[in-house]
């Protein structure tokens, strides 16, 4: 158990979304037997010593903290900033970490990239491919035969119907409904679309 204890986990981003991800991360680690003091916030902006019971570290402090391994989930809404942070973490040997709420529904043949965040009440139906560092915020769903790129953000309540391709860095706003595509002729949401 000691090597397990010595790994350090971070929610990168201590603003509103990060504070929503932290309890999910805490619960996920508790189920894996990881002590809550091995979970921290990391933020580049100065702030209080603790937020909602977890220590707040700068990125430099996170790297300096003794740990067998470091893992970070990127709770930053901007896909562009997430991509830069993902590159920085990789260069510094910080592992991408995904966080999934306990009540997420995941059906058949769902492939997830690294670093994905799935908030409470997210549903992923069947035959779906999702790229790296995707954010699925509360009450969003992704229906059958969808392909979602890297660094895509779904705000709360996004309804992504069947046969849709969402390209890298797209940001889909709260309550958006993406109408269904046709088999063999998917609806495409372009790269970087907002």
Predicted regions mapped to residue ranges:
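Structural signal for interior beta-strand "rungs" in well-ordered beta-sheet cores
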Residues: 99-194
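Glycine-rich, phosphate-binding/catalytic loops in enzymes
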Residues: 27-28, 89-92, 134, 152
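Compact structured core domains
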Residues: 57-111, 115-123
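A general structural motif
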Residues: 5-6, 36-38, 69, 93, ...
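Short amphipathic alpha-helical segments
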Residues: 22-24, 53, 84-88, 130, ...
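A solvent-exposed beta-alpha-beta segment
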Residues: 4-79
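Short, flexible, glycine/charge-rich loop motifs used to bind or transfer phosphoryl groups or to couple energy/partner
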Residues: 1, 28-32, 47, 60-64, ...
């Amino acid at each position: 158990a000691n090597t397990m204890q010595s790994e350090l986990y971070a929610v990168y981003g201590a603003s509103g979304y990060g504070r929503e991800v932290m309890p999910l991360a805490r619960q996920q680690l508790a189920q894996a037997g990881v002590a809550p003091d091995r979970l921290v916030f990391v933020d580049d902006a100065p702030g209080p010593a603790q937020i909602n019971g977890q220590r707040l570290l700068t990125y430099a402090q996170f790297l300096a903290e003794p740990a067998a391994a470091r893992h970070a989930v990127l709770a930053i809404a901007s896909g562009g900033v997430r991509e830069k942070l993902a590159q920085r973490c990789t260069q510094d040997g910080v592992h991408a970490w995904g966080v999934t709420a306990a009540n997420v529904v995941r059906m058949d043949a769902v492939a997830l990239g690294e670093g994905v965040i799935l908030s409470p009440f997210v549903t992923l139906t069947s035959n779906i491919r999702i790229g790296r560092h995707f954010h699925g915020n509360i009450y969003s769903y992704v229906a059958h035969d969808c392909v979602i790129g890297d660094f895509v953000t779904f705000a709360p309540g996004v309804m992504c119907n069947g046969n849709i391709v969402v390209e890298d860095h797209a940001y889909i706003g709260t309550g958006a409904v993406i109408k269904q595509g046709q088999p063999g002729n998917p609806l495409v949401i372009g790269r970087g679309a907002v």
